[in-house]
Amino acid sequence: MKIALDAMGGDMAPQANLKGAIDALDKSKNKELNIILLGNEKIINEFLGNNISSSLSIVHCTDEVTMHDNGSKIIKSKPDSSMVKGITLVKEKKADAFISAGNTGAQMAASLLILGRIKNVKRPGLAVYFQSLNGGKILCDVGANPEVKPEHLLQFAVMSSIYLNHTETIKNPKVGLINIGVEPSKGTNLYQETHKLLSSELTNFVGNVETRNVFDSEANVLICDGFVGNTIMKFAEGCFSTFSEMIREKIMEKTRYKIGAGMIKPALDEIRNKFDFEEHGGTPFLGVNGISISCHGASTAKAIMNSVFLAEKSIKENLIHDISIGIDDHIGVMS
């Protein structure tokens, strides 16, 4: 099993990426696991020093994809970048998966152009995994497709359900449609038509879900267009960040607050760890014909390590094959 890792992508690259790779090899029970590091060979070797393992190999790259690069153009403009080379390794069957904490838009575009789509997939979806009051959930789409049709949202639901089944072993995840009200008549024409389609096609569809219930809804999979999903995701990030800072500032005001905070610190740490993106790692682009995992730009070594484990699990459990079968089950609607 070979996993290609973009050593140069992310805010903490290459240090966090390389340490994450080493930690993954140290902790993995899979003796067949090999990690291909893509990036500047000199920089990689300087960091690795004596930590060179027979399970690590390096592919030298002279180009680097930045956050300002246009994803659809990097294949021609930066063919020797770690991102393009890594995705190409998956295409050529020289790697089983690719991981990057770099430019998400560029990775999505390059993955789609190089790997193509799974047969009958109309639009690949960008999903995000998060914890809630009742376990892990998937929100899809979170930015790849601002404009969609009902059949695209159906495919997002199918692919996300299969992916969550792989990560959380939930056999029949419940699907909810993000909307401004729970009634079927709520929302734009797109969402009304999507509600009808999901109701007829999915036995696990539980109806509309308002954004205030994202974290406590019975739905395990939440579906929406990319504009709505991206807004929800970034608003939630901002709320958590601001709320955490407000608590910290308030605690520092009085001694008794500090004492109280110390007493509940273990509980707060457990909650923080539950919502920590590092625990899950990254998320694969759903619908792309190959495993291409996107990580948070601020990924630490722990996040990279867990992304390697996620890739390993996706490979072992034939995620791409299962998504293909799931899509075929609804092919009549897509025609």
Identify the role of each PLM range.
Residues 13-18, 80-93, 97-111, 122-127, ...:
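Short glycine/serine/threonine-rich phosphate/pyrophosphate-binding segments
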Residues 52-95:
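Phosphate/nucleotide-donor binding subsite
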Residues 20, 24-26, 110-127, 193-198, ...:
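A glycine- and small-aliphatic-rich helix-loop capping segment at beta-alpha/alpha-beta transitions
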Residues 112-123, 131-139, 221-222, 226-335:
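Glycine-rich phosphate/nucleotide-binding loop
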